[in-house]
Regions:
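Specific aromatic-rich, kink-prone transmembrane helix
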Residues: 103, 139-156, 161-169, 190-192, ...
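Extracytoplasmic
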Residues: 178-179, 226, 352-521
């Protein structure tokens, strides 16, 4: 018996070690292939800014949560500022997702070889779609971890999970408001259903302790770094809510093809829990309060939330990582059928085939970086900029056939910036420039993108944005604006904001515009 137990334990250690290596390495590999400037460098620069004393909401306008950027600053602090430590951040979270999936499945007594298979396949599809730290992936991981925690709280009756759940939801929400807010609603709803039959003082205590600790940490950070509450309210709540009004339109029309058929493999992967949930409720509605059905409802709710979020986001398709996860739960509950081996084989094959398909179609071709139709072999080692970008394979959709030309243009811009000792603000999607030059870019926005990140004229909260930008120019004594094209979401930051007689525009080369500020009535009003 001892020998058998020892063998199983050693086997488990082997699978866990292999899972860590695979989940970390595969993301690390893809993080170095290709660049989408507007997305690839935003967290790179924000993490560097925080490390050097510039803080979100206070020093730069952001509707993205600060958690991602704070974690990146920590990675830079301990591992140095480089693309390797940047990629290691997202690779670590890919590994965390893989391990938590593995241990959650193991709690259902799924054989460890199957826990390993499903967790590995999920990690292959999770973070490598982008490779580098990205809000949608981080919030998805925090959200999935909160779902796992509630599933385990229901299954194991351990109170510690009730403490963990609000902490994970808090981290998720301050990574990105949605879908974290939707998951919070789902979890509160399922928790209430669970507590109707399983009310315990300990559960309430641990849950409130998690909520209290999260709120205390948030308020402490806000006061310590002197971040105005009004800025947080406007940037992270009010303006995004105004965007939500237009994003809701993206859900229309409500069509079977968009909501179901397009994501059919995800539905099929979860088909066993869906079937059992419907069957049990049909027999007796009050079966809904049974633990097993609450877990099914959690999984179905997660599916609906992720599909809704995918339809409302402007970013690339990424939710196919759910297929191996949901297939694993269908595998677990296949034992309720006589021909369970047939179902098990089906869900294993579905997971393998879908992983290969989506990996080849989206990940390997760097689809989310808009590089699908490009020859990635034309990429250039970005170490020509700096050793900080060593081994990054530089190629973008802006210069698909001549990355060397893009690099040459950017190197010329860097030289122009070096020569200018005036206080400057950089407006660019290539936000690595200030990091390499070890200067403050004095950027007023985490990402320069009208409407999606900050309001346009005539939109709600435009005056808030205008005041924020002009106050920053005055406070930081900015003399000149360096605008580096191409920009995905901006042309001229002053357009519709101040009159043309407040600045001179000098076109230095094909990608660089230098705007020198002049004395004018609008700028004087901020002095």
């Amino acid at each position: 018996m001892k020998t058998k137990t020892s063998f199983i334990q050693n086997q488990s250690y082997f699978y866990i070690s292999l899972l860590i290596i695979i989940s970390f390495s595969i993301n690390q590999y893809y993080a170095f292939i290709g660049v989408l400037p507007v997305d690839s460098f935003s967290t790179f620069n924000a993490g560097y800014d925080i490390l050097n004393g510039s803080y979100p909401f206070k020093d730069f306008w952001t509707i993205k949560g600060p958690v991602l950027d704070i974690i990146q600053a920590i990675y830079f602090k301990f591992f140095g500022v480089s693309w390797f430590s940047y990629a290691a951040h997202s690779s670590s979270f890919n590994t965390i997702f893989a391990l938590t999936t593995y241990f959650t499945l193991k709690k259902f007594d799924l054989e460890i070889k199957y826990c390993f298979i499903y967790s590995t396949l999920a990690s292959i599809l999770m973070y490598p779609t982008y490779g580098i730290p990205f809000t949608d992936h981080h919030v998805s991981i925090f959200s999935m971890l909160s779902i796992y925690a509630l599933i385990l709280a229901i299954k194991t009756n351990k109170n510690i999970y009730w403490f963990i759940i609000p902490v994970l939801l808090f981290l998720g929400f301050f990574t990105k408001q949605t879908p974290a807010a939707y998951f919070a609603i789902l979890i509160v709803f399922i928790s209430i259903l669970y507590l109707i039959k399983n009310i315990k003082k300990e559960i309430i205590f641990f849950g409130l302790a998690g909520v209290s600790m999260s709120i205390f940490c948030f308020i402490s950070l806000v006061f310590f770094y002197k971040i105005p509450f009004n800025s947080i309210l406007t940037q992270y709540f009010l303006f995004p809510m105004s965007l939500g009004e237009t994003r809701l339109e993206w859900l229309l029309p409500f069509e079977f093809q968009r909501f179901v058929f397009r994501h059919k493999l995800i539905y099929i992967a979860l088909s066993i829990p869906i079937f059992l949930l419907v069957k049990n409720i049909y027999k007796n509605f009050f079966n809904l309060f049974e633990k097993e059905n609450l877990i099914f409802l959690l999984l179905v709710g997660s599916l609906i939330i992720f599909i809704t979020h995918q339809l409302m986001t402007i970013n690339g398709l990424f939710i196919f990582f759910l297929i191996p996860v949901f297939a694993a739960f269908s595998h677990i509950y296949s034992d309720k059928f006589k021909n369970k081996s047939l179902f098990i084989n089906f869900f294993l094959i579905l997971s393998f085939v879908s992983t290969i398909y989506y990996h080849q179609k989206y990940i390997d071709k760097r689809d989310t970086l808009i590089l699908r139709n490009l020859d990635l072999n034309k990429s250039v080692n970005a170490s020509v900029f700096s050793e900080k970008l060593k081994n990054l394979k530089w190629i973008t959709h802006h210069y698909p056939n001549s990355p060397e030309k893009e690099i040459e243009n950017l190197l010329n811009v860097i030289q122009e910036i070096k020569k200018d000792n005036r206080n400057k603000m950089l407006v660019t999607d290539y936000q690595f420039i200030s990091v390499l030059l070890k200067i403050n870019d004095n950027s007023a926005a985490r990402i320069w993108w009208r409407h999606h990140i900050y309001p346009e004229p005539e939109e709600k909260h435009f005056e808030d944005w205008k005041n924020f930008l002009l106050n920053k120019i005055y406070r930081d004594k900015i003399d000149v604006i360096y605008t580096i094209h191409p920009l995905e979401g901006e042309k001229n930051i002053f357009e519709g904001l101040i009159e043309n007689d407040c600045y001179n525009s000098n076109y230095i080369n094909e990608i660089l515009v230098v705007q020198e500020l002049k004395e004018c009535k609008e700028l004087k009003s901020f002095k």
